[in-house]
């Protein structure tokens, strides 16, 4: 929990979250940023239901692509899965390569 809150113990150095972008796709909210020295990039993906965060995912020094799978009609997901050729990328991280080193890439399907 220390990483998510930015809280620190007396024996560790502090970490300052610097958010650079926040976007939402339906019930998923993505926040991306880095530390104050821009040496560590981070991405938080929150799932929100009825105004309450119900799930949190945290990625550090990782490139993330958010892809929509399935059809959304009138704000509701249909049970039908879209063919792979119709899976569209709706967001890609921008700041994961700032540290000048290669990072792993992940796909978050929503």
Swiss-Prot record:
Inducing factors: Accumulates in leaves during senescence. Induced reversibly 4 days after exposure to ozone O(3). Triggered transiently by Nep1, a fungal protein that causes necrosis. Expressed in nematode-induced giant cells (e.g. M.javanica) at early stages, 3 days after infection.
InterPro entries: NTF2-like_dom_sf, Wound-induced_1/12_sub, Wun1-like
Residue pairs linked by disulfide bridges in the UniProt entry: none
GO biological process: leaf senescence; response to fungus; response to molecule of fungal origin; response to nematode; response to ozone
Pfam families in alphabetical order: WI12
Source organism, top-level taxon: Eukaryota
Name of the protein: Senescence associated gene 20
């Amino acid at each position: 929990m220390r990483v998510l809150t930015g809280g620190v113990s007396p024996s560790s150095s502090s970490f300052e979250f610097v958010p650079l972008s926040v976007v939402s796709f339906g019930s998923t909210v993505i926040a991306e940023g880095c530390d104050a020295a821009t040496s560590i990039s981070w991405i938080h993906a929150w799932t929100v239901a009825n105004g309450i965060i119900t799930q949190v995912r945290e990625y550090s020094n990782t490139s993330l692509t958010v892809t929509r799978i399935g059809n959304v009609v009138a704000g509701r997901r249909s049970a039908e899965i879209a063919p792979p050729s119709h899976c569209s990328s709706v967001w890609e991280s921008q700041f994961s390569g700032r540290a000048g080193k290669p990072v792993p890439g992940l796909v978050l399907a929503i």
